[in-house]
Swiss-Prot record:
Residues 486-635 form the PID domain. Keywords: Cell cycle, Cell membrane, Cell projection, Cytoplasm, Cytoplasmic vesicle, Endosome, Membrane, Nucleus. Multifunctional adapter protein that binds to various membrane receptors, nuclear factors and signaling proteins to regulate many processes, such as cell proliferation, immune response, endosomal trafficking and cell metabolism. Regulates signaling pathway leading to cell proliferation through interaction with RAB5A and subunits of the NuRD/MeCP1 complex. Plays a role in immune response by modulating phagocytosis, inflammatory and innate immune responses. GO terms for biological process: adiponectin-activated signaling pathway; cell population proliferation; cellular response to hepatocyte growth factor stimulus; cold acclimation; diet induced thermogenesis; glucose homeostasis; negative regulation of cellular response to insulin stimulus; negative regulation of cytokine production involved in inflammatory response. This is DCC-interacting protein 13-beta. It comes from Mus musculus.
């Protein structure tokens, strides 16, 4: 090894300018070495950090490979080979992670640590000795300055002796510090060469050991496994290329179709219309009412399933029932100056939903398909043959009607005329009950009204020529004169669930069946909105009052309530049947279902008490006995178990105030 430069220790005592000049060269070299060592340490720490990160990365990769099996892939067919392969690779990653961890430890011990020790021990020692040498030189200079100022005359032997001793001590101290400093600088020239080599030897040994153990781990069995995995990937790639070629050919064929596929009604004359359909799918626009006179149209995907018309919004997993098509009727209509509109009506003739197709072909095929399905020919042995016989009927249905008046003329039921303006708010539930008892209570396919507000009935009844009684409209004045004179006033908080027509009021079973159908329809159609009202029971009427405005929403004569009952299991459900005379002289029956804050039996008790009061008002003695059997308020009205305060959530005085305002 070539000789190194050295400082002569013999020149330390003399401290000549030449010695100082040579010392400055060594100091500059030590400073450069310090800067380089710091940069070298940063680079080696980066290598160690990268190796440490490699350990963490391989560990995370191993866990992620095992997590593939736990992923709930929607399309996981044929993943067994992939899962087993990933499990094997995860095991390999764990072994490889052990090698990386060991390599990181070796790099820390044999590469990074020696450089740190060299910097902290040798370079720091040189820096410290440099500072001590500087202090000793300064002290020597000060003592020599004192010694030089000794006077030539009047010498003070005592002072001279002290200064001489001080100079000797300072010179001895400087000599000692310079010798130590020179030795450290000379040793640094040797140590820096070793300090540069030793970390690299550790790095090389660590890498060699890592690769050797890696080669041992990746044995012939590993080579065979990798070969089989490579063959599997190549076979998948071949299948992918073949499938890609097929898809390119199919894409070219599909794109080579005529422009009529993209443009609706581009050539109406040549459109081939299939009138024998017993099932149909496609996008239609559905008309929805958003207010008294406002509507919106929503584009949805419709399809038929047996005798049901289903709708599936984009992004939904499955479709929902829109309308039962059995025994329904379909006809073209003019609606809001839109083309290709048709309406599906209920079996009783009441208008139902209005749909719009995108083309003439889709328009006619939908009408024909619904017309065929409505006659339940999908249940026959040869539905298509039966559908051909019904084509003429379907063609007649395609002819649009120009007004609701013409539609009313073609209807043979007065019930159709009465409800033609309000059926856009109705949803026709599927008649699921097949036992005769249920059909005797409620006709299959009877529409359900979910909103207690029916604005369409606020107009004049043209059949009677006068103002029509509005069972669900708001009263013109806010006072209830009959409530002031009534012996009974009881208030309950209720929420309207639905109402529907029934066939009989001879049994409470009709109310239970109506409850079942209303709740089932709400569940099927995801209807959660309910109108909250105050139900005031008097000895004359049942009145529904808006809790905010205290305006009457509906009023029923208590004598018209022919049946009332609470649910046998859900005690908060209550319903009653109303008998209403029609303009034709006949009477109609409707049941109304509510959910109450209190038990439904309390409402039934109040209604029953009101009807008893009506009966005994003709007999003063019976009325007196009844008044004695029931507690009264200060103004002579009946109180029922403090229900008023419990239901309304306020004080009795507040409730009486609400009644008087109503």
């Amino acid at each position: 090894m070539p000789a190194v430069d050295k400082l002569l220790l013999e020149e330390a005592l003399q401290d000549s300018p030449q010695a100082r000049s040579l010392l400055s060269v060594f100091e500059e070299d030590a400073g450069t070495l310090t800067d380089y060592t710091n940069q070298l340490l940063q680079a080696m720490q980066r290598v160690y950090g990268a190796q440490n990160e490699m350990c963490l990365a391989t560990q995370q990769l191993s866990r992620q490979l095992l997590a593939y099996e736990k992923q709930n892939f929607a399309l996981g067919k044929g993943d067994e080979e992939v899962i087993s392969t990933l499990h094997y690779f995860s095991k390999v990653m764990d072994e490889l992670n052990g090698l990386h961890t060991e390599l990181a430890k070796q790099l820390a011990d044999t590469m990074v640590l020696p450089v740190i020790q060299f910097r902290e021990k040798d370079l720091t020692e040189v820096s410290t000795l440099k500072d001590l040498f500087g202090l000793a030189s300064s002290e020597h200079d000060l003592s020599m300055a004192k010694y030089s100022r000794l006077p030539k005359k009047k010498e003070n032997e005592k002072a001279k002796t002290e200064i001489v001793k001080e100079v000797a001590a300072a010179r001895r101290k400087q000599h000692l510090s310079s010798l130590q400093y020179y030795c450290a600088l000379n040793a640094l020239q040797y140590r820096k060469r070793a300090a540069m080599m030793e970390p690299l030897i550790g790095f090389a040994h660590g890498q060699i050991n890592f690769f050797k153990r890696g080669a041992e781990m990746f044995s012939k069995s590993m080579d065979g496994f990798l070969s089989s995995v490579k063959d599997m990937v190549q076979s998948i790639q071949v299948e992918l290329e073949a499938e890609a070629d097929k898809m390119r050919v199919s894409q070219q064929e599909l794109l080579s179709v005529s422009e009529s596929v993209y443009t609706p009604d581009i050539d109406v004359a040549t459109a081939q219309i299939n009138r024998n359909l017993i099932q149909k799918t496609g996008y239609l626009n559905l008309r929805n009412k958003t207010g008294l006179v406002t509507t919106t149209w929503e584009r949805l995907y419709f399809f038929t399933q047996g005798g049901n018309l289903m709708c599936q919004p984009r992004g939904a997993v499955a479709g929902g029932l829109i309308q039962d098509l059995d025994n329904c009727s379909v006809m073209a209509v003019d609606c809001e100056d839109r083309r290709y509109c048709f309406q599906i009506s209920t079996p009783s003739g009441k208008p139902g939903i209005i749909l719009q197709a995108e083309s003439r072909k889709e328009y006619e095929e939908w009408i024909c398909a619904v017309n065929n399905i409505s006659r339940q020919i999908y249940l026959t042995d040869n539905p298509e043959a039966v559908a051909i016989k019904l084509n003429q009927t379907a063609l007649q249905a395609v002819t649009p009607i120009t007004s609701f008046g013409k539609k009313q003329e073609s209807s043979c039921s007065s019930q159709n005329i009465k409800n033609s303006d309000i059926e856009d708010d109705n949803i026709v539930p599927k008649a699921t009950a097949s036992i005769p008892e249920t059909e005797e209570l409620i006709a299959p396919g009877t529409p359900i009204q979910f909103d207690i507000v029916l604005p369409a009935t606020e107009f004049l009844d043209q059949n009677r020529g006068g103002r029509r009684t509005n069972p669900f409209g708001e009263t013109e004045d806010g006072s209830f004169p009959e409530a002031e004179d009534s012996l009974l006033q009881q208030m309950f908080i209720v929420r309207f669930l639905g109402s529907m027509a029934v066939k009989t009021d001879s049994t409470a079973e009709v109310i239970y069946e109506a409850m079942r159908q209303v709740l089932a329809a709400r569940a099927i159609h995801n209807i959660f909105r309910m109108t909250e009202s105050h139900l005031m029971v008097t000895s004359q009427t049942l009145r529904l009052i808006d809790p905010q405005t205290q305006v009457s929403r509906a009023c029923f004569e208590l004598t018209s309530v022919t049946q009332f009952a609470a649910h046998q299991e859900n005690k908060r459900l209550v319903g009653f049947v109303i008998r209403v005379p029609e303009s034709t002289g006949e009477e109609s029956l409707s049941t109304y279902i509510f959910e109450s804050n209190s038990e439904g039996e309390k409402i039934c008790y109040a209604i029953n008490l009101g009807k008893e009061i009506i009966e005994v008002q003709k007999d003063p003695e019976a009325l007196a006995r009844l008044m004695l059997s029931v507690p009264l308020t200060n103004d002579g009205k009946y109180v029922l178990l403090n229900d008023q305060a419990d239901d309304t959530g306020g004080s009795p005085s507040e409730n009486r105030g609400a009644e008087s305002e109503a």
